């Protein structure tokens, strides 16, 4: 069985994601497609606009065969750990033949070359990186500058690296490749050229609009019909059904009062989070005292050293309660389970193959005794239930995977 995989967030699913699914199937000629998906919180530091079960069902309705949850620890981590969490789970299944991701460059060889350098870290690169970090530059920017300078004698390569590393999907793709190399994985990587608007673009465009633009529209408007051209048909119909039922979309602003209350109540333990360097915790506390919206709060805290998405992830982690866990140890380990959110009949065949070839624990219902990684997911869903009145406290214990039969794909 030729099984391919994709790593997704679907916040929310749009036409660009459908294009990714269709191109992956064509490029890899796979018999089945597995996706590992962020749950109720996503990597840019936002609550997901739709809950993880609704997102998973949409994925199955649009051509995915099996949806696995990416543990929240990884979905709210840097690109490096986000990628490692996803790839390590896929690798441990022992049945995934290929992985396909979107990138702005669409050239797997160029991305592989950079990934190899970053993983091997030659001495000159390490020295350059340290010099830039000592100047107070963010890690991502310092890494880019170090790579460019490392290739300064090759002007064409240097210019290409600078361009490649300025674009988010290229960066994420490099991290997937690094993880595959680190794990010595047999999974073959493919990349497709990303189509459509940049993820930061908040304006709706014909055919391929960004998830950011769709979230902004849903936040500010009631007429869902405008989005018909920007969403897969099944996704659009699901949005209409949810709105009719009174579903409330989870937005980042809805977290702020809870975060401010936690701080006011004396929970000043941000320093326990691994992304919080010395002094950043006090910077955040001061900003919490006077900012009442997500954008104003993050906007005041961010700097050339602290990127917007990093601050957003810290706020989500604080909201959930990550600071009470030994995150360093968790991130150094590999997950020993996969949590199934949804499947079709072909996906059930994939699960049978996993059982034959892997010792990984497969969870369709939560076990009585949960490990730390899984307990963080439960905690995340409970925090998410404060933002989305369609999700109950301890919803993870009530939900089983949706099995969708006779899908057209």
UniProtKB/Swiss-Prot annotation:
Pfam families: HIGH_NTase1. Gene3D superfamilies: HUPs. GO terms for cellular component: cytoplasm. GO terms for molecular function: ATP binding; ligase activity, forming carbon-nitrogen bonds; tRNA binding. It is an enzyme of class 6 (ligase). Keywords: ATP-binding, Cytoplasm, Ligase, Nucleotide-binding, RNA-binding, tRNA processing, tRNA-binding. It comes from the Bacteria. Its EC number is 6.3.4.-. ATP binds at residues 7-20, 102, 169, 194. InterPro entries: Rossmann-like_a/b/a_fold, tRNA(Met)_cyd_acetate_ligase. The keyword Membrane does not apply. One of its GO terms (biological process) is tRNA modification. It is found in: Cytoplasm. Belongs to the TmcAL family. Catalyzes the formation of N(4)-acetylcytidine (ac(4)C) at the wobble position of elongator tRNA(Met), using acetate and ATP as substrates. First activates an acetate ion to form acetyladenylate (Ac-AMP) and then transfers the acetyl group to tRNA to form ac(4)C34. PANTHER family: TRNA(MET) CYTIDINE ACETATE LIGASE. This is tRNA(Met) cytidine acetate ligase.
């Amino acid at each position: 069985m030729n099984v391919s995989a994709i790593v997704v967030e679907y916040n929310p699913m749009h036409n660009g994601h459908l294009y990714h699914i269709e191109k992956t199937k064509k490029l890899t000629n796979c018999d089945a497609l597995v996706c590992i998906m962020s749950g109720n919180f996503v990597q840019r530091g936002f609550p997901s606009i739709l809950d993880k079960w609704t997102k998973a069902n949409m994925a199955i309705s649009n051509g995915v065969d099996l949806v696995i949850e990416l543990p929240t620890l990884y979905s709210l981590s840097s690109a490096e750990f986000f990628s490692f969490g996803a790839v390590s789970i896929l690798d441990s299944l022992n049945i995934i033949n290929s992985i396909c991701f979107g990138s702005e460059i669409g050239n797997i060889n160029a991305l592989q070359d950079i990934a190899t350098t970053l993983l091997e870290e030659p001495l000159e690169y390490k020295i350059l990186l340290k010099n830039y970090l000592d100047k107070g530059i963010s890690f991502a920017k310092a890494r880019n500058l170090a790579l460019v300078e490392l290739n300064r004698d090759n002007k064409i390569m240097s210019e290409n690296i600078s361009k490649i590393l300025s674009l988010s999907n290229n960066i994420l793709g490099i991290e997937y490749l690094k993880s595959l190399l680190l794990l010595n994985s047999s999974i073959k990587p493919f990349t497709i050229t990303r189509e459509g608007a940049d993820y930061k673009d908040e304006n709706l465009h014909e055919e391929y609009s960004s998830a950011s633009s769709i979230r902004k529209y849903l936040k500010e408007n009631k007429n869902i019909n405008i989005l018909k051209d920007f969403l897969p048909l099944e996704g659009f119909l699901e949005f209409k059904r949810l709105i009719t039922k009174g579903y409330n979309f989870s937005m980042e602003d809805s977290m702020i009062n809870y975060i401010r209350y936690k701080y006011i109540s004396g929970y000043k333990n941000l320093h326990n989070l691994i992304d919080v360097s010395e002094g950043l915790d006090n910077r955040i506390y001061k900003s919490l005292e006077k900012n009442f919206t997500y954008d104003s709060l993050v906007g005041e805290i961010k700097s050339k050293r602290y990127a917007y998405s990093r601050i957003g992830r810290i706020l989500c982690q604080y909201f959930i309660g990550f600071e009470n866990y030994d995150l360093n140890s968790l991130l150094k380990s590999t997950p020993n389970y996969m949590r199934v959110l949804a499947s079709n009949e072909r996906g059930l065949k994939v699960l049978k193959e996993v059982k034959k070839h892997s010792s990984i624990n497969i969870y369709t219902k939560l076990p009585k005794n949960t490990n730390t990684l899984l307990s963080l997911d439960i905690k995340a869903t409970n925090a998410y239930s404060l933002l989305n009145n369609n999700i109950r406290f301890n919803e993870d214990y009530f939900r089983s995977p949706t099995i969708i039969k006779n899908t057209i794909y």
